[in-house]
């Protein structure tokens, strides 16, 4: 069954960033339950019982949808998929908690904030790259030469995003604290305006925004998250969807298709970069730059991944950004690990 989601075309970085406005209604007051422990997965149902199922999937910058379409992995899905576009991961977690989406791929930090807030979500899949696309940018004429030079300066960053985690880790590495810089919490649309107008000194951001700013505006890299952050991304599912037999079955199939699509992109980098650039309406040079360093193949959601995320959670707690008390492991569900492993093995 083909997805009924419509492709989206974006014309500029500002328009791309402004997509956060489409989900403002999802990020307000959300009722959270106390269900923070893994529950037994319901029995899988047959494919013919998926004919009336629609998976609501949160997307960022068209990445998930574009990847699945370019690879052809959506073509034979026995259920429908409706994509909603978000600019960053935190509102995706909010929407999943509210039951307004069933699944989304986020960076490494939004699930950390979800754990702190007792969000009704589970982390069900993991992805990785070297984090080189997560960068702290400065204007072309900036005289700043290192992260330490940001002492007393203003840094635009999305609260609860992977960029937020990157900044805290850079502060820790430099022996600084959040008191030594001015964090200006802005989503990409407003951060772009603040950055280009000189209202902030630096912008902590991720691809493709990083690549677009570099290609179109000549922005300079002050530092990257490579060898600083863990570079993980995560598939986050709503507890409601996981508890529903039909949606649980569709979700297992979906994460398998996504893993196969990621493997396809790795094997066809030029084709994928061109398809991605067209799908989200960005400069092909920026698309090639972003996808050359920010692809995320699926990996096992194992103890090492969970421990790394717990360490990131602890950094946020120590900074006073989130309350402690919860553990990341309690918000992880590995029910799809075997299916994803089998899928990725078959593509190698």
Residue ranges and their predicted role:
Residues 30-33:
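Bacterial signal peptide processing site
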Residues 316-348:
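Conserved C-terminal helix/tail region of periplasmic/extracytoplasmic solute-binding proteins
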Residues 65-71, 93, 97, 108-111, ...:
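Extracytoplasmic/secreted envelope proteins and their assembly/folding machinery
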Residues 244-323:
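Secondary-structure end/capping motifs
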Residues 2-16:
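Bacterial N-terminal signal peptides that target proteins for export
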Residues 35-177, 184-185, 229:
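Short, glycine-/small- and polar/acidic-enriched structural segments
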Residues 24-28:
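C-terminal motif of bacterial Sec signal peptides marking the signal peptidase cleavage site
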Residues 109, 184, 189-278:
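Pocket-lining segment of extracytoplasmic ligand-binding domains
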């Amino acid at each position: 069954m083909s997805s009924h989601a419509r492709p989206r075309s974006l014309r500029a970085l500002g328009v791309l960033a402004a997509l956060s406005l489409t989900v403002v209604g999802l990020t307000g007051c959300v009722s959270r339950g106390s269900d923070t422990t893994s529950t037994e997965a319901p029995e899988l149902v047959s494919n013919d019982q998926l004919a009336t199922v629609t998976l609501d999937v949160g997307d960022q910058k068209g990445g998930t949808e574009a990847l699945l379409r370019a690879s052809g992995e959506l073509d034979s899905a026995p259920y429908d998929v409706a994509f909603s576009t978000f600019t960053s991961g935190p509102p995706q977690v909010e929407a999943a908690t509210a039951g307004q989406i069933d699944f989304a791929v986020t960076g490494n930090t939004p699930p950390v904030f979800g754990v702190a807030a007792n969000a009704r979500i589970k982390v069900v899949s993991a992805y990785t790259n070297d984090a080189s696309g997560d960068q702290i940018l400065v204007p072309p004429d900036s005289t700043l030469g290192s992260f330490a030079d940001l002492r007393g300066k203003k840094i635009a960053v999305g609260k609860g995003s992977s960029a937020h985690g990157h900044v805290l880790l850079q502060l820790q590495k430099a022996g600084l604290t959040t008191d030594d810089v001015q964090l200006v919490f802005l989503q990409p649309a407003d951060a772009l305006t603040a950055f280009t107008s000189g209202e902030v000194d630096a912008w902590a951001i991720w691809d493709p925004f990083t690549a677009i700013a570099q290609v179109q505006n000549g922005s300079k890299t002050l530092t990257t998250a490579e060898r600083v952050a863990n570079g993980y991304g995560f598939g986050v599912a709503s507890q409601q969807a996981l508890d529903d037999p039909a949606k649980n079955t569709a979700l297992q199939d979906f994460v398998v298709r996504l893993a196969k699509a990621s493997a396809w992109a790795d094997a066809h980098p030029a084709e994928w970069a061109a398809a991605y650039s067209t799908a989200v309406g960005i400069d092909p040079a920026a698309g090639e730059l972003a996808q050359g360093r920010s692809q995320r193949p699926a990996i096992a959601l194992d103890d090492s991944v969970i421990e790394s995320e717990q360490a990131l959670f602890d950094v946020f707690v120590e900074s006073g950004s989130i309350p402690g008390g919860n553990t990341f492991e309690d918000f992880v569900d590995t029910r799809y690990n075997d299916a994803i492993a089998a899928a990725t093995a078959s593509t190698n």
